[in-house]
Amino acid sequence: MDRQQAERRAAELRELLHRYGYEYYVLDRPSVPDAEYDRLMQELMAIEEQYPELKTSDSPTQRIGGPPLEAFRKVTHVVPMMSLANAFDEGDLRDFDRRVRQEVGEAAYVCELKIDGLAVSVRYEDGYFVQGATRGDGTTGEDITENLRTIRSLPLRLKEPVSLEARGEAFMPKASFLRLNEERKARGEELFANPRNAAAGSLRQLDPKVAASRQLDLFVYGLANAEELGIESHSEALDYLQALGFKVNPERRRCANIDEVIAFVNEWHEKRPQLPYEIDGIVIKVDSFAQQRELGATAKSPRWAIAYKFPAEEVVTTLIGIEVNVGRTGVVTPTAILEPVRVAGTTVQRATLHNEDFIREKDIRIGDAVIIKKAGDIIPEVVGVVVDRRDGDETPFAMPTHCPECESELVRLEGEVALRCLNPNCPAQLRERLIHFASRAAMNIEGLGEKVVTQLFNAGLVRDVADLYRLTKEQLIGLERMGEKSATNLLAAIEASKQNSLERLLFGLGIRYVGAKAAQLLAEHFETMERLERATKEELMAVPEIGEKMADAITAFFAQPEATELLQELRAYGVNMAYKGPKRSAEAPADSAFAGKTVVLTGKLASMSRNEAKEEIERLGGRVTGSVSRSTDLVIAGEDAGSKLEKAQQLGIEIWDESRFLQEINRGKR
């Protein structure tokens, strides 16, 4: 076969294999025997081996897996992959529906099965698959393109030459999971606890051939750029994705109201065991994109969607002992040490006991048969005692009076249920602060997890976060299981963390009551650490959602000489102390009508998109939020303004129409 013939035949084979693969892996309706598919695949592989230049990015042979990767690159999600708020019962679902209707009126919902796998993003250019990434922290994930390419239900080429970014869930079917664990058991390897862990572990293999051997699957459940493509609803987006050749779960339903949603939830609670894959709940989304825009999002999750989690599985096991741990803020927490037991697909040996009052109220004793469940199917907790099983050998537990780490006296502050160690130099607190500082939500220092921090701390190499920026390769190589390459990578990650925006550093400092959302609000408002350090209590409380308790904690933190010294050291090492997001009041004209104002947009503007309006308001010193409250200063109402306008009228909030809005932003440009 000459090259011209080979080129024609390779194109024919790619078309045939794409069609047969789609019929088998997506439609589950194969039209040819497996042997015929394999024969055609072998023929294409032989042609590509003889003429390597004929190999294309969408060739079915690319699913077999290429050479191992050195490491996974970071990928920034243009549209964040936000997590969802949870619902645990019918009441939570009805509360969600009530909040939606208060904001946008009546709404239809789309219900989908919540696949228990790994959330991924897949990007296509002109119809060709070009990049896949993990969710990561929602803003930044890892490039797993080559591993996703091995999933046969994921199209390498779409049926239309469109550019898009889809979101989906990669998972391991139950049959594949059982087969994989049987193979690992035969080889004497550690078994995977559940299909979710197996899927996540497979997609994070540096060798794509390993991922290819694991028989993963993928359902697509969203389209990040749907509105750019002229699509107006989530249900329409799912139909469009399916028409392009994606595998979209057929077990979905558009519901006219919350009663239909609850019926769908109850139906799948019963039918769940019959599925060939694991699900842990139902995802409910407002169908209309226009209503989704109006509802907006919090810092953590969209207001237009919620994840109903199936009731947690409960099991009984023996409480062997109770361990007391000290957290980064000095809170002392009791942890149950259990006879190993499987709960919701994982082996559990430890569970939270919350606090001393909880142990006393439940009369939990060492040696008891205790009931364990996973809260939200994630955190194991002791929920009760099987008193009938007591034989008299059980031992009541008493919380210690002194810190188990530094032996300082434990105290209970007024109004709190937790015991605290108030020694700021307690080794446990210092260690936990370092772990928090390096965590994904804070400075995101890859490779600096609990084990490495503990080694560094025990070796006397670090005591506070500034010490991290003094570490050398020679010091790291001396640690257990830390080679030269690992040390180089860790130092690079520490160096990269210096460029983080202010909100990450602020959250990483571990100021009491300041979570990730509050850190974001403070960074946006003050823009530099210097301004925040100088802020008075009143200035702090002027920031939306910053209350008196948090303001007191922030001023107390910056009043400490140790905090001043720490920040000086971090500055000296080049750690960024400025907010890197969109600038607001610093660029606003002094007479801007928006300066320092909290603004809500509702309805449709004829002159610009909602995002463009938001940018204009922020340019002129305002802050845009998604819902109307007593802290709202101004509401801008376009056409078809809904319940937000009514609420603003009830609260006596100033309201502008579009013409007044345009007048002000044009004045701000002069």
Curated annotation (Swiss-Prot):
CDD domains: BRCT_DNA_ligase_like, LIGANc. Zn(2+) binds at C403, C406, C421, C426. Its EC number is 6.5.1.2. The keyword Iron does not apply. PROSITE patterns: BRCT, DNA_LIGASE_N1, DNA_LIGASE_N2. One of its GO terms (biological process) is DNA repair. Gene3D superfamilies: 5' to 3' exonuclease, C-terminal subdomain, 6.20.10.30, BRCT domain, DNA ligase/mRNA capping enzyme, Helix hairpin bin, Nucleic acid-binding proteins. Pfam families: BRCT (PF00533), DNA_ligase_aden (PF01653), DNA_ligase_OB (PF03120), DNA_ligase_ZBD (PF03119), HHH_2 (PF12826), HHH_5 (PF14520), Nlig-Ia (PF22745). SUPFAM superfamilies: BRCT domain, DNA ligase/mRNA capping enzyme, catalytic domain, Nucleic acid-binding proteins, RuvA domain 2-like. The keyword NADP does not apply. NAD(+) binds at D34, A35, E36, Y37, D38, S83, L84, E112, R135, E169, K285, K309. Residues 589-670 form the BRCT domain. InterPro entries: BRCT_dom, BRCT_dom_sf, DisA/LigA_HHH, DNA_ligase, DNA_ligase_AS, DNA_ligase_CS, DNAligase_adenylation, DNAligase_N. PANTHER family: CHROMOSOME TRANSMISSION FIDELITY FACTOR 18, DNA LIGASE. This is DNA ligase. It comes from Geobacillus kaustophilus (strain HTA426). The gene is ligA.
